[in-house]
Amino acid sequence: MAWQGLLLAACLLVLPSTMADCLSGCSLCAVKTQDGPKPINPLICSLECQAALQPAEEWERCQGLLSFLAPLSLGLEGKEDLESKAALEEPSSELVKYMGPFLKELEKNRFLLSTPAEETSLSRSLVEKLRSLPGRLGEETESELMGDAQQNDGAMEAAALDSSVEDPKEQVKRYGGFLRKYPKRSSEVAGEGDGDRDKVGHEDLYKRYGGFLRRIRPKLKWDNQKRYGGFLRRQFKVVTRSQEDPNAYYEELFDV
């Protein structure tokens, strides 16, 4: 009776595992063949796997498909393992590059050390160096970035100064003779006193208007007949009565 109970318990324990294997295999086969001309029915496949149905055509097809897919899955797993190993080795190789000098120093001093106190002091110094290593790397990158930013700022400031301060030759090319005829107004404010300011203003007026001020004389007196006549002759080409020929006047009267 004891042996029969043990066999029954073993069968009950094995049955769920075999059922789970059949279900997983048949479901995988059904997924792979669902777009094909003859898809595998997962229910019939699982029953044939458990030897509940005969003949086991669906299960045999599924076994052939699983045997074909097994090497492919193994190859993909191998590729994933290699990629994961490479991804893990990359940071380790970078760490070895930075830690190489410290490790060499440790190997050299290992043969020279004789007391455990020296070994502990060396290990502490090595740990401190390793802790400060990421900070140094961050500071180096930050200093490089700051240097690039300062260079860019300097270039921008130099460009701004060049644009604000133009060469006089460039001004002459751009404006031509305009600067020679009409000088800058800053010369009007150059004098310190009132007299200097008036003098500078007169000079600017003479430079700006040229002979116009010499041709039109502002100090003509109208009470003088000679000057009045000369002014009319110069400006309006009018001849005064005193300068006309009297005979011409009489001739006009006789003609009327």
From Swiss-Prot:
Domain of life: Eukaryota
Record carries keyword Signal: yes
Key words, A-Z: Cleavage on pair of basic residues, Disulfide bond, Endorphin, Neuropeptide, Neurotransmitter, Opioid peptide, Secreted, Signal
Cellular location(s): Secreted
Cleaved signal peptide residues: 1-20
PTM comment: The N-terminal domain contains 6 conserved cysteines thought to be involved in disulfide bonding and/or processing.
GO molecular function, one term: opioid peptide activity
Function in brief: Leu-enkephalins compete with and mimic the effects of opiate drugs. They play a role in a number of physiologic functions, including pain perception and responses to stress. Dynorphin peptides differentially regulate the kappa opioid receptor. Dynorphin A(1-13) has a typical opioid activity, it is 700 times more potent than Leu-enkephalin.
Protein name (record): Proenkephalin-B
Organism (species): Sus scrofa
Encoding gene (name): PDYN
